[in-house]
Curated annotation (Swiss-Prot):
GO terms for biological process: L-proline biosynthetic process; proline biosynthetic process. Its EC number is 2.7.2.11. Belongs to the glutamate 5-kinase family. This is Glutamate 5-kinase.
Length: 356
């Protein structure tokens, strides 16, 4: 079994503002036991900026990107020192892997393959990879959303069987502040989202839910839970937090690539009727298109967004943005006459992945 643990900055910090060494010890002990079952474990760990701030005596979350990157440079080595020291007490070896967003790009496929090969070799050697975004050189500001999405991309890269996201919230809570034990339809629980991140984190529950939605679409189960969780229970999908069940629709690899590695060139906004049709496995027809954002050509990948602003899918378009502007809202028969084409769909269902 392959398990990815995602640890945010807030989980690494105690109430007193120190690095939580006891949690890292508990995690190492749990991973040691998982190894005894033959499981492979990877850690996606935030905390470089937090660790750098602790080392330099900075108490407030930095707003300046250059300062963040400088703190990440100082903090990443200290963070890995902590992992190495604590995990070695349990006979575990760790390996640092720093990634940037362009690793997960179809246009730079060799970087993806190289990163995957490195992670596979580390796992083969019995090493626990500790993965973080390379904040010190990132061009865009912390683009992975407190590493929630990075954890999903890594899970996809290594064909993980489970993604565990540790959260100070302990799981997804309903409107009465009760943890929801199991979620099968993630669209229905977005209404419970609250929080935009902690002092040194950039995520929050919305980021975690959006990342979880992508993971479950990729057929990866996700658990959001607290750091008090029993590590061994997790491998059996038992949790005191929230278990998000994977989608029942099995995606072929080409669609998984669209969902993860293809950078969208634009956005197509659809109405409620089209959203329900897409959820039911139908193609996207011009009649359901409300508007188009960006400039793209035929064959490009775009994001599909509902009228509430939620990204609900991605897919390869049969028409350019200019053509879709002309045919949006029209019936199929009208489209054929206007564009002199035999194609009916803006995006065919075979070239589309829906996150609902």
């Amino acid at each position: 079994m392959r398990i990815v643990f995602k640890i945010g900055s807030n989980l690494l910090e105690t109430d007193e503002g120190d690095i939580d060494l006891s949690f890292l010890s508990k995690l190492a002990e749990g991973i040691k036991k998982l190894h005894s079952f033959g499981d492979k474990v990877l850690i996606v760990s935030s905390g470089a900026v937090l660790s750098g701030a602790k080392k330099l005596g900075i108490k407030e979350k930095p707003k300046d990107l250059t300062l963040k990157q400088a703190l990440a440079s100082v903090g990443q080595s200290y963070l890995m020192h902590l992992y190495d020291t604590i995990f070695s007490n349990y006979g575990l070896k760790v390996g640092q892997v720093l990634l940037t967003k362009d690793v997960f790009s179809k246009e730079k496929e060799e970087r993806f393959k190289n990163a995957k090969s490195t992670l596979e070799k580390l796992l083969e050697l019995g090493v626990v990879p500790v993965i973080n975004e390379n904040d010190a050189v990132a061009v865009e500001e912390l683009v992975f959303g407190d590493n929630d999405f990075l954890a999903v991309y890594v899970s996809f890269m290594v064909n993980a069987d489970l993604l565990v996201i540790f959260s100070s919230a302990g799981g997804l809570k309903d409107d009465k502040d009760r943890i929801i034990p199991v979620v099968e339809d993630i669209e229905k629980v977005f209404k419970y989202v609250r929080g935009t991140g902690t002092s040194f984190g950039t995520g929050g529950m919305r980021s975690k839910l959006e990342a979880t939605r992508l993971a479950t679409t990729l057929n990866i189960p996700v658990i959001i839970t607290s750091k008090e969780e029993n590590i061994l229970d997790l491998r059996n999908l038992k949790t005191k937090g929230t278990l998000f069940k994977p989608s029942k629709r099995k995606l072929r690899n080409a669609l998984k690539v669209i969902a993860t590695l293809e950078e969208p060139k634009g956005i197509i906004v659809v109405d409620r009727g089209a959203q329900e049709a897409l959820k039911a496995g139908k193609s996207l027809l011009p009649a359901g298109v409300v508007s188009v954002q960006g400039n793209f050509k035929r064959g490009d990948v775009v994001s599909i967004q509902n009228e509430e602003g939620l990204i609900i899918g991605k897919g390869k378009v049969n028409f350019s943005s200019e053509e879709i502007e002309k045919i949006k809202g029209l019936k199929t028969s009208e489209v054929r006459k206007l564009l002199n084409t035999t194609k009916d769909e803006v995006i065919h269902r075979d070239n589309m992945v829906i996150f609902l």
